């Protein structure tokens, strides 16, 4: 095993954030291609094409051509181990995506040159902001006509509130796209349309004043020189400290579908992006340098492999190392468990791992005992913080076509809700089952998976619920009185936590005023 593989400082764990259709899945594919993890990139162009994108492996994703679950992919580049967490780009998938961002040390933002900063990117950026996550930016699709690069940088600065430092700069775009200029290497990489699935080394010209540049790209050479002068005066110079503090984003341009501009981005990413960072727990801050193992569960995925009806808990390693067969404490249930078969991932291809260090993601087989937010250590009592659970915003009543399947329905709904994208509620005053989600597409996903994975056919009906809140009180008497008086509005979630299901926003406001000793919470820590 190579030396760098055993050095946690050589780990880079990141996620890609973007608006749907900015080309995130293609960028993911091409990073894997340049990282040597896949020999042939499955283009995402033909949605029904035979070769599906490596990172979209769940059946429904393949049918629809969108990334629904957070895949984890590990590859090696320039003697660094890179863990890429693929977040769903579809506008629906907030919860899973938010939680994924708690498990990374940096992020890559992908922006469509024609569309600029879009609403979904703004939301994801807000989450990164909460933790000052360092962000690199890739402006994609330069092989098409788009907006002026300088205008895009202005938009990123004003809308997202982060300084931009262009590292590479495009030479034209669309039909006039000639290449990119790396401002810090003083090298022009000439554009040639990459055969989609293969790596192509771009032709390089050293120096902006090189006469060879004029020979090869004609008038575009003088235009580039003028633009670079303007950029020097109008934009920020790259500052590593500002980037690591989440205050500045280095910006790269390219065309992922043509494999262009990706290698320059990847080389710099490995050099500048942070390794594993310290993590906060309720008790203290855990440093990645510590020798004893600690980690937290940020995602649970049911039935990753239909051949083995299984559930996998994804654990971010925060300190120490995982070694095959080691014993770990599962703190929430107070049990010591032996972990002999943790998994590492290459999007759906699983292999048993002998070693995982801080920054790595491992998969633990879960037979219903592990939940999102659980902490594993080698004995110390710690609880990692900052892993959110959001109250759903959309609700449906779940009905069975076959009443004899009610046990299988409850099992399916609870197991799927453990993945964290949906939540199931059981009202105290009835036997009904209510499904809550943050995005509308989740209802389709659940119905599809209930049918295919649990053999349960369900239908949805509308239900009179506008919003849901977890309810707590430190005053037992007040809580007991509240339970009695608000009984018809109360339900238990999948983890048996009490929730208030309000038929209208006004009803919720009145309840908050009427019961001042009860806390109504829209989010809770796992």
Curated annotation (Swiss-Prot):
This protein's UniProt keywords: Cytoplasm, GTP-binding, Nucleotide-binding, Protein biosynthesis
Domain of life of the native organism: Bacteria
Pfam families registered for this protein in UniProt: EF-G_D2, GTP_EFTU, RF3_C
Keyword GTP-binding: yes
tr-type G domain mapped to chain residues: 9-277
Primary residence: cytoplasm
Subcellular location(s) per record: Cytoplasm
GO molecular function: GTP binding; GTPase activity; guanosine tetraphosphate binding; translation release factor activity, codon nonspecific; translation release factor activity, codon specific
Residues engaged in binding GTP: 18-25, 86-90, 140-143
GO biological process: regulation of translational termination
Record SUPFAM superfamilies: EF-G C-terminal domain-like (SSF54980), P-loop containing nucleoside triphosphate hydrolases (SSF52540), Translation proteins (SSF50447)
Entry keyword annotation includes Protein transport: no
GO cellular component: cytosol
Protein family according to the UniProt entry: Belongs to the TRAFAC class translation factor GTPase superfamily. Classic translation factor GTPase family. PrfC subfamily.
Role description: Increases the formation of ribosomal termination complexes and stimulates activities of RF-1 and RF-2. It binds guanine nucleotides and has strong preference for UGA stop codons. It may interact directly with the ribosome. The stimulation of RF-1 and RF-2 is significantly reduced by GTP and GDP, but not by GMP.
Protein name, as recorded: Peptide chain release factor 3
Organism phylogeny: Bacteria, Pseudomonadati, Pseudomonadota, Gammaproteobacteria, Legionellales
Originating gene: prfC
């Amino acid at each position: 095993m190579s030396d760098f593989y055993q050095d946690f400082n050589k780990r880079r764990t990141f996620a890609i954030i973007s608006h749907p259709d900015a080309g995130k899945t293609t960028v993911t594919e091409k990073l894997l291609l340049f990282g040597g993890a896949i020999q042939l990139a499955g283009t995402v162009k033909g949605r029904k094409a035979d070769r599906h994108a490596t990172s979209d492996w769940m059946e429904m994703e393949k049918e629809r051509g969108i990334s629904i679950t957070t895949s984890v992919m590990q590859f090696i580049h320039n003697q660094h181990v890179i863990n890429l967490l693929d977040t769903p780009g579809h506008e629906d998938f907030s919860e899973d995506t938010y939680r994924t961002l708690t498990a990374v040390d940096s992020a890559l933002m992908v922006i469509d040159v024609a569309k600029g900063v879009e609403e979904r990117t703004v939301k994801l950026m807000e989450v990164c902001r909460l933790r000052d996550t360092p962000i690199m930016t890739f402006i994609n699709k330069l092989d098409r006509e788009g907006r002026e690069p300088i205008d895009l940088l202005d938009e990123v600065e004003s809308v997202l509130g982060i300084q931009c430092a262009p590292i590479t700069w495009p030479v034209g775009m669309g039909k006039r796209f000639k290449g990119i200029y790396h401002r810090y290497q003083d090298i022009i990489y000439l554009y040639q349309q990459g055969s989609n699935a293969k790596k192509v080394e771009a032709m390089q010209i050293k120096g902006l004043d090189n006469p060879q540049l004029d020979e090869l790209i004609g008038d575009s050479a003088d235009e580039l020189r003028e633009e670079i002068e303007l950029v020097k005066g109008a934009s920020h110079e790259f500052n590593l400290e500002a980037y690591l503090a989440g205050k500045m984003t280095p910006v790269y341009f390219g065309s992922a579908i043509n494999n262009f501009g990706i290698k320059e981005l990847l080389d710099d990413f490995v050099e500048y992006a942070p390794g594993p960072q310290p993590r906060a727990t309720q008790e203290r801050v855990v440093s990645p340098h510590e020798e004893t193992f600690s980690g937290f569960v940020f995602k649970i995925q049911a039935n990753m492999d239909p051949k083995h009806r299984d559930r996998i808990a994804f654990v971010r390693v925060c300190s120490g190392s995982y070694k095959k067969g080691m014993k770990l404490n599962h703190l929430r249930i107070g049990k010591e468990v032996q972990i002999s078969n943790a998994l590492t991932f290459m999007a759906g291809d699983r292999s048993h791992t002998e070693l995982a260090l801080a920054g790595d993601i491992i998969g633990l087989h879960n037979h219903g005992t592990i939940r999102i937010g659980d902490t594993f250590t080698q004995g110390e009592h710690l609880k990692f913080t900052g892993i959110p659970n959001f109250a759903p915003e959309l609700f449906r009543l779940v009905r069975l076509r076959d009443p004899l399947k009610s046990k299988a329905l409850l099992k399916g709904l609870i197991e799927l809700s453990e993945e964290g994208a949906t939540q199931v509620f059981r009202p105290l005053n009835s036997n009904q089952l209510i499904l809550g989600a943050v995005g509308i597409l989740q209802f389709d996903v659940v119905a599809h998976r209930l049918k295919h994975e649990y053999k349960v056919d369900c239908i949805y009906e509308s239900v009179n619920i506008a919003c849901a809140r977890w309810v707590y009180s430190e005053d037992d008497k007040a809580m007991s009185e509240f339970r009695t008086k608000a009984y018809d509005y109360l339900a238990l979630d999948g983890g048996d936590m009490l929730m208030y299901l309000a038929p209208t926003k006004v009803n919720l406001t009145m309840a908050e005023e009427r019961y001042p000793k009860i806390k109504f919470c829209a989010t809770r820590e796992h």
